């Protein structure tokens, strides 16, 4: 790809790439995230907040990156409440990437889940996520309580007042911290070059629960009462006692 070409052209310049660990070059820092770990904690919160035991996950496009979110979330739900079920859907199938920007289709999918008794929905779908929040707002207006879970940033902070009432938490992925990390190190004349894959020659850093790369947000205060359980799960993941799957069904 372009970064491979440009990094070879400018060997004395340090480059950074997010969500990609395929460029084998010492002057390319790959910033990758353990989204499955943050999603596991979101699953713990979802299982504890759900009254029906029916939970939903909607990804934007069925690709390995978003299946990491799915796998972790389902594992977190199941570890917390064995009897709970997770309805998994994707807005589009690969290679149709419109699933990241189709809130109308997301809303239809989530409404279908709500009709079947789902009362917590986690969406990892870029711009399509707005459809999840709209569906929950409309359900609330009709007298049905449905919790939503945001993704990447703390979406409570940018939600409308109506959406905030139903936003349980967000799975936060601190791309901001990772990029700052790389730039701050570059300014100091250092590189962020942990070995990610020795055989393939991939360098960079994995951002996970141990270094605050992923997590869940407490804005709104709705999951404050579950903090002990969430912290306990996080501690087990950090110690390796819980191995969170990054592939569905594993």
What are these regions (language model features)?
Residues 1-250:
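A residue-level marker of the well-folded mature domains of exported/periplasmic proteins
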């Amino acid at each position: 790809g372009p970064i491979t070409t440009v990094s070879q052209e400018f060997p004395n310049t340090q480059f950074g790439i997010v969500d990609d660990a395929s460029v084998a070059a010492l002057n390319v820092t790959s910033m990758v995230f353990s989204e499955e770990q943050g999603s596991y904690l979101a699953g713990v919160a979802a299982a504890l907040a759900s009254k029906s035991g029916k939970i939903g996950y909607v990804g934007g496009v069925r690709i390995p990156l978003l299946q990491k979110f799915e796998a972790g979330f389902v594992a977190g739900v199941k570890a917390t409440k064995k009897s709970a079920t997770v309805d998994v859907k994707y807005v589009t199938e690969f290679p149709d990437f419109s699933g990241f920007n189709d809130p109308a289709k997301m809303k239809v999918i989530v409404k279908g889940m709500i009709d079947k008794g789902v009362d917590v929905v986690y969406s990892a779908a870029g711009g399509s996520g707005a459809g999840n929040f709209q569906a929950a707002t409309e359900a609330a207006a009709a007298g049905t309580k449905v919790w939503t879970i945001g993704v990447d940033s703390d979406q409570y902070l940018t939600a409308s007042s109506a959406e905030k009432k139903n936003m349980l938490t967000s799975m936060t992925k601190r791309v901001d911290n990772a990029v700052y990390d790389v730039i701050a190190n570059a300014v100091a004349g250092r590189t962020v070059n942990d070995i990610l894959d020795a055989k393939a020659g991939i360098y960079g850093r994995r951002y996970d629960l141990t270094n605050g790369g992923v997590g869940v947000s407490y804005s709104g205060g709705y999951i404050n009462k579950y903090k002990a359980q969430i912290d306990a799960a996080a501690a087990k993941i950090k110690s390796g006692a819980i191995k969170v799957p990054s592939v569905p069904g594993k």
